[in-house]
Structure formats: C-alpha cells, structure tokens
C-alpha cells in the first residue's frame, strides 16, 4: 500500500479544512515547500496536493507553487480547479505526475472524457467525495459546497468503462475529524469495483487504520491532519 501525505494549499499556506468547510480552516506555520521537502527526505514517494483556492474558484490558482514543491524530487498528484483541457495540459506539461479531477467528473462528463483521452487514464485520479446521508453515497462538488444527485457507484461504473483505474474516495463526514475512516464504504468500493486502485482519505488516525484499509484491498491512503500530530512518526508508517 502507498502512503501519500496530503498538503492542502490556501493563499500559499498549508491548511486543513474541517469536513470541507471553508469557514473552519486550520492554518499551519510550516511553508508548503518545506513540508514537501520534509516528506521527500522521510521517503514518501508521492504527495497529494489540493489547491483549495482553485477548487473554490473553478480555476487552479497555485500551479507555480505546486511546481516549486515538485522540485524537491517527490512525485505529485494535484488538483483543485482543473476544469478545462487547457488547464489539464498546463498541469501535465508542468510535470505533475497525476492530475486529480473532482467536480468536473460530475458536472461535465463529456469534457472529463476528453481530458482522460488527452492525458491518458493512467495519469488521472478521479477524486470522488461523498456524503453518506442514506445507504447510498452521494457525491459532493465544488469544494464540497454543493451536493449532487449522482451516486458514487454509478459514476465509478461510468468512468471505469472509459479506462479510469485510480479513484480517490473521501467520506466528507470523516474528513478532518480524526475519528477513523468509513471502513464500510471502502469495503463496498473494493467489492463492487475490484479492478479500481482505490485511494482512501478522511479520518485516518493511526497505523491500525492504515492496516485495516490495506486488508480491505485499498491501494493507497491519503494522510492529512494525522501528519500534523506530534506523536506521529511518518517513517514508521512507510514500513
């Protein structure tokens, strides 16, 4: 299993949102490039970077900063506001390893398919964020500001038929809460779509959570708030 540190960017700083709410922001004193270099030195193979300003505005705002983070030598999967072929190509040409496509996959499937065909499916990670208010996980869009009527399962089925292999799934209710991930959701995801390389995010607290997710068949975990805790040894998580 791949352990991927997450860095959320807002106005050039490292931040975390609580349950995706922009009015509940925790800002950290460490600078993004320093944070990326820190994880690279510890042996991380990949970073997950989200441009929150881009996610909110609909156009990536911090590509220059993300490219600077990439110069630390660590591969980056990045998203937040990629809403056109031009933006996708700009990010890809800048050397970003995998582009993270979120809301666009729900609001404009035709354009998303064009991007997938242009960039290639293996270079795309679909970020599908859900609210499980009923038994059916429904997708949220636009930086979690709006709900859609699309279910996770129907959207995954659609894009799997178009070659997508990597999907990052977050239960919004778990994100930033440090109460544990939604294991039932990920178990269903792997059972329904075993050919997808699932990335889990939201609520992961400790090594036991990571081990449990691995036993369910999850391919990668995204670690955010957990890595800002003083008692966490990231090198041990990589073992």
From Swiss-Prot:
InterPro entries per record: Aldolase_TIM, His_biosynth, Isoase_HisA-like, Isoase_HisA-like_bact, RibuloseP-bd_barrel
Keywords noted in UniProt: Amino-acid biosynthesis, Cytoplasm, Histidine biosynthesis, Isomerase
GO terms assigned for molecular function: 1-(5-phosphoribosyl)-5-[(5-phosphoribosylamino)methylideneamino]imidazole-4-carboxamide isomerase activity
Keyword Amino-acid biosynthesis: yes
Gene3D superfamilies referenced in this protein's UniProt entry, alphabetically: Aldolase class I
One Pfam family matching this protein: His_biosynth
Known pathway: Amino-acid biosynthesis; L-histidine biosynthesis; L-histidine from 5-phospho-alpha-D-ribose 1-diphosphate: step 4/9
Name listed for the protein in its UniProt record: 1-(5-phosphoribosyl)-5-[(5-phosphoribosylamino)methylideneamino] imidazole-4-carboxamide isomerase
Organism: Legionella pneumophila (strain Lens)
Gene name, Swiss-Prot/TrEMBL: hisA
